[in-house]
Amino acid sequence: MKSRTTILGLSAAIFTVLSFYSVSPSVAADVPPLEERAAWFRHDRFGLFVHWGVYSTIGRGEWVQDTGKIPLAEYIKLYPKFNPEDFDAAEWVALAKSAGQKYIVITTKHHDGFCMFDSKLSDYTIMHTPFGRDICKELADECRKQGLKLGFYYSIMDWHHPDYTPVRPWEKGKRSTKGADFARYCKYMKGQVRELMSNYGPIVALWFDGGWEHKSDEDKKAFKDIIAVARQLQPNILVNDRAGIGGDYKTPEQRIPATGIVDKEGRPAMWEACMTMTTGHGSFAPTAWWGYDAHEKIFKPTEELLHKLIDITSKGGNFLLNVGPEPSGKIRPKETERLEAVGRWMDKYSESIYGTTASPFRLLPFFGRVTQKGKRLYVHIFDWPKDGKLVLPGLESMPAKAAVLGRPDAKLGMKRNNRDGIDEVLLMLPKEASDPIASVIALDFDTRPVVKPLVIKPAKDGKLKLPAAFVEIRAKHGQRAKPVSKDGRTCVGNWSNPNDVAVWCFTMPKAGSYRVELDARAASEAVVGQRVEISVGKSKLVAKIA
């Protein structure tokens, strides 16, 4: 009888439990191929995102001009008072370097249109503030001095420029757009990109944003022309996907793609997940702001940030972790502390991140992730098994050598098993974890290891178990759900966003009727009565948690 592969999706209203397609403009013939330009990107894996601008003086996030419905005439009164005297480029770069971050991307101009660089095309810049210094120039010089790479974020959207349209919905009828000419604005944008690509030395990435309001063929042509200028001046540059015409790499925001990202041919694509340390417990909650939010109460803990870095790397992506400096120019202590803590882990285990590729395992029966570097696998263990046993299912070759990184004297045992026709390697671990957040086991093979995909299917008694360790969390912007471990058991935790869906792919020998049991736990009674929807294909089951 033919087996059928099924996808089960589980979503909750509020439920808390523990080179893709690219349109390339005509550019100079000496632009290197993508694989050559992207070598650093695939190696470095970890970067620092900086959202900083005049909006920081209000302390309610980078969108405050819009969310606070501040008229332009009022908003522009901020920049003559912007004087970040505590800004120290050397301090910023040193912090990123100590965290193990290999590159920095800074907002040269965000949606409010204020320029953090010396642009000769506008007076609305950092040079016309009491501070009067080119932030981007100082950062570029310091990155070169300390050996980090630099990328520039640039917003297509501009709430200040008179030629940019459309205006914000709440401004309609209040702010005139008479005489506005978007084509003229594009010339302004091209001029600023030319400045950014000409005056700051080697720039590794051009990080566009805010292009979603302009999708016409005419607009796309203008954006292609702008990118062509960037490539002509910086032949090795990578351009992201946010100008609406494709790009060199994808940029999922505030989420981790469940299984990485592939191109149209099914090949691994380049991608970079950008995320904040903020959690949305501040201004205009539940949005987690990128720019400084003085009211944010909760920041992601170091453990979560490290798990995200490892998870993203194991799926073939890069992690661009954001900070939102204070108006003084200082990076907040809570962000600094977390970066320093991440750096202490990277000091010991960075070889399991830099230069690695995605995990060969589709599923793992434990709370952890795997990265690969040629004939070596790095097994990251987030929750050390109490019985000291760790199974790697589908691994068809026996490691020639195994070692606990950071503990060269630790003893490891290995045994080869075959369970239900599937090869597996059993690791017998030391009694104690080598790291409280993520221990790393290095497995060396004589040849590149081959892994047979693990297939979820019913046991001999017909029962199908879908453990949280095998879940794919498919999320949109603003992912909250994440794998967590409680008392040695992996769960889907922090499930407060109904757009986060838990998915299992499994194979059934035949169709039938099944009784569904869901194990839900929470730290409070708030979960009781919440709606849960379970879907298999077109069939749906809706229930409430009792």
Task: Enumerate the predicted regions with their spans.
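Mature catalytic domains of secreted/periplasmic carbohydrate-active enzymes
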Residues: A29-S513, A520-A546
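Sec/Tat signal peptide C-region and signal peptidase I cleavage site
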Residues: V23-A28
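Hydrophobic residues within membrane-embedded alpha helices
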Residues: I7-L10, I441
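Intrinsically disordered, low-complexity segments enriched in glycine/proline and serine/threonine
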Residues: T5-I7, V536
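Bacterial N-terminal signal peptides
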Residues: G9-S22
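Intrinsically disordered/low-complexity terminal segments and short unstructured peptides
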Residues: R4-T5, F15, R489
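Positively charged n-region of N-terminal signal peptides that target proteins for export
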Residues: M1-T5, A96
